[in-house]
A protein has these predicted regions:
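Short, T/G/N/S-enriched strand-turn elements that build extracellular solenoid repeat scaffolds
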Residues: 1, 14-21, 34-40, 53-60, ...
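Well-ordered beta-strand segments characteristic of repetitive beta-sheet solenoids
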Residues: 4-12, 24-31, 43-50, 62-71, ...
Length: 178
């Protein structure tokens, strides 16, 4: 049974590998969060961890907010069901390769890591607003080799280098790539 609210704060590693955390509102603050093959579900999920490993993990919520320096999401899933803003604030490397999935119903979605690796991964934006990917403020790299980046709205992609070999990037209402 899900707790009303769950807040976990540690100055070390929070390890939910293979585990399950569920609550109405879930807040996790740690130096490192490991959710490898774990499950996190709540109406609202908020994660703050400089190092966040969600490899094989599943995070599902109406609202998701992630703040990390580096996020590894190999074969993991971040699924936001609600239409509110989804926060995936990664300042370093966002590695969604190897079957990673980021999907949201939010009106807009902005991803602004210094490096985005979506090789073999999927980023799906069901909102009708704008999907913005800004790798390194226009100087970073975006790789989407055999990956999929799609939006029902407008796609704006900015990167210093971009590789979409065998990949798909599409925007229902338009696509801008620089």
């Amino acid at each position: 049974t899900a707790a009303q609210n769950l807040q976990v704060t540690t100055s070390g590693t929070l390890d939910n590998s293979g585990g399950s955390m569920s609550a109405a509102t879930l807040k996790a603050n740690a130096v490192s969060l490991k959710n490898a093959n774990g499950t996190i579900s709540a109406s609202t999920v908020s994660v703050t961890a400089p190092q966040f490993d969600n490899s094989g993990g599943k995070i599902t919520a109406n609202e998701i907010n992630v703040s990390a320096t580096n996020l590894t999401n190999h074969n993991g899933a971040l699924t936001q069901l609600g239409s509110g803003a989804m926060g995936v604030n990664v300042s370093g490397t966002l590695d969604n390769s190897g079957g990673g999935l980021i999907q949201t119903n939010s009106t807009d979605l902005t991803l602004a890591p210094s490096t985005l690796n979506n090789n073999g991964g999927t980023i799906t934006h069901a909102g009708t607003g704008t999907l913005t990917i800004d790798s390194g403020s226009g100087t970073g790299s975006l790789t989407n080799v055999s990956g999929k980046i799609v939006t029902n709205g407008l796609a704006n992609l900015t990167a210093g280098s971009m590789d979409d070999t065998g990949g798909t990037i599409s925007g229902q209402t338009g696509l801008n790539a620089t």
